[in-house]
A protein has these predicted regions:
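A beta-strand edge to alpha-helix "cap/lid" segment located at domain peripheries
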Residues: 2-31, 38-125
């Protein structure tokens, strides 16, 4: 059964994730991710939590804006899944700055009452 409080917390987590990515606040972003977190890029490349945070910090991944977000959220007990669709301003892996129609499928788990991201699969919509 989905709790409206959980949905609000997960919506906030999505917004905070992008705020942290844009600000290059890898400490705040890292606190949202499990130690075994994996990001799967749209190319299929996989990044560990450490590698993902390092790529944000060193400028390999640059995020500038996130607009027009639409979220679908489902919660089952201590696990949740979000699909977020946003227009994201980014320059990644040495490419130019573009607006991406980015879709993130995000898996989360609740630990000690707090939600953590375990897996993100990126694509476009």
């Amino acid at each position: 059964m989905e709790d409206k409080g959980d949905k609000a917390l997960l919506e906030l987590a999505y917004s905070e994730m992008y705020r942290s990515m844009i600000a290059k606040d890898t400490v705040a972003l890292g606190q949202m991710l499990t130690d075994n977190f994996v990001l799967v890029h749209m190319t299929g490349m996989r990044q560990s939590k450490h590698d993902y945070l390092r790529a944000i910090a060193d400028g390999t991944l640059n995020y500038y804006s996130c607009d027009d977000s639409v979220l679908e959220i489902s919660v089952e007990g201590d696990t949740a899944r979000m699909t977020g669709r946003s227009r994201v301003g980014a320059a990644v892996f040495g490419g130019g700055r573009h607006i991406w129609r980015l879709q993130l499928k995000i898996w989360l788990e609740r630990q000690d009452g707090k939600w953590f991201m375990t897996l993100i699969k990126a694509g476009t919509f």
